[in-house]
Curated annotation (Swiss-Prot):
Keywords: Cell wall, Cell wall biogenesis/degradation, Membrane, Secreted, Signal. The lineage of its organism: Eukaryota, Viridiplantae, Streptophyta, Embryophyta, Tracheophyta. Belongs to the expansin family. Expansin A subfamily. Residues 180-261 form the Expansin-like CBD domain. It comes from Oryza sativa subsp. japonica (Rice). It is a peripheral membrane protein. May cause loosening and extension of plant cell walls by disrupting non-covalent bonding between cellulose microfibrils and matrix glucans. No enzymatic activity has been found. May be required for rapid internodal elongation in deepwater rice during submergence. SUPFAM superfamilies: Barwin-like endoglucanases (SSF50685), PHL pollen allergen (SSF49590). This is Putative expansin-A30. One of its GO terms (biological process) is plant-type cell wall loosening.
Length: 266
């Protein structure tokens, strides 16, 4: 099943340099907890190399470079939520078919792409269209699918639940734009894994500039922010938890690089 893809930001993220700098955290007690098990279906796209999963509608670019690897999924529109579902983590098991591996092993995947609807088909009438609203559906990378079921099945029923994302290190900000426009891709998000709001501040003084959601996991600010160290405030879409990452970049920051904070969600 085909999944949406994007070439925007791929080259920049491939060449990204991760720069770790000091940050300070301010949080509220809003830890994300695993949700209840729910029935759905899963398919896969691409081959064993997972090359077709690179890029994607979240804008993470090369998934090896951005830390997500091949344990990834393209979400149906219902779960993707116009990009606010990017970075969320799901645990699932194949159930109810001989194609499931013995013991029904659980896998955990990160949402990195959109599985678009196919209105010409209806799964209730024996066709495709498994990603059509209001269905919850997962179009997995083939390596992820193969860890829970025989790939020759093509599609299997699953039980899934959303779970906290375990990430090593702090939030990562891949920066693009021009002297008058900053576009930041937020990656390596722990906890709920998603981002619902974001602010940026340049230098030690001045106020916070609220960023608007662009697409996928990216946020933008129309402001001149060059030549000053950048700090970010990030709010989780699901929990409302906010963290402050101070001094994420040096004053000499550059477009095309990725900078890592020392804070992350709980």
């Amino acid at each position: 099943m085909a999944a949406a893809s994007s070439t925007t930001a791929t080259t920049a993220i491939l060449a990204a340099v991760i720069i770790s700098l000091a940050g300070a955290a301010t949080t509220v007690d809003a830890k994300f907890r695993a949700m209840q098990w729910t029935p759905a279906h899963a398919t896969f796209y691409g081959d064993e190399t997972a090359s077709e999963t690179m890029g994607g509608a979240c804008g993470y670019g090369n998934l090896y470079a951005s830390g997500y690897g091949t344990d990834t999924a393209a979400l149906s529109t219902t779960l993707f939520k116009d990009g606010y579902g990017c970075g969320t983590c799901y645990q699932m098991r194949c159930v109810g078919t001989a194609s499931c591996y013995r013991g029904s092993p659980a896998i955990t995947v990160t949402a990195t792409n959109l599985c678009p609807p196919n209105w010409a088909e209806d799964p209730d009438r024996g066709g495709g269209g498994w990603c059509n609203p209001p269905r919850a559906h997962f179009d997995l990378s083939k390596p992820a699918f193969m860890r829970m079921a025989d790939w020759r099945a093509g599609i299997v029923p699953v039980m899934y639940r959303r779970v906290p994302c375990a990430r090593a290190g702090g939030l990562r900000f891949a920066l693009q734009g021009n002297p008058y426009w900053l576009l930041a891709y937020v990656m390596n998000v722990a906890g709920a894994g998603d981002v619902g709001d974001m602010w940026v501040k340049a230098g030690g003084g001045g106020g916070w500039v609220r960023m608007s959601h662009n697409w996928g996991a990216s946020y933008q600010a129309f402001a001149q922010l060059g030549g000053q160290a950048l700090s970010f405030k990030v709010t989780s879409y699901t929990t409302g938890q906010t963290i402050l990452a101070a001094g994420v970049t040096p004053a000499s920051w550059c477009f095309g690089l990725t900078y890592q904070a020392r804070v992350n969600f709980s």
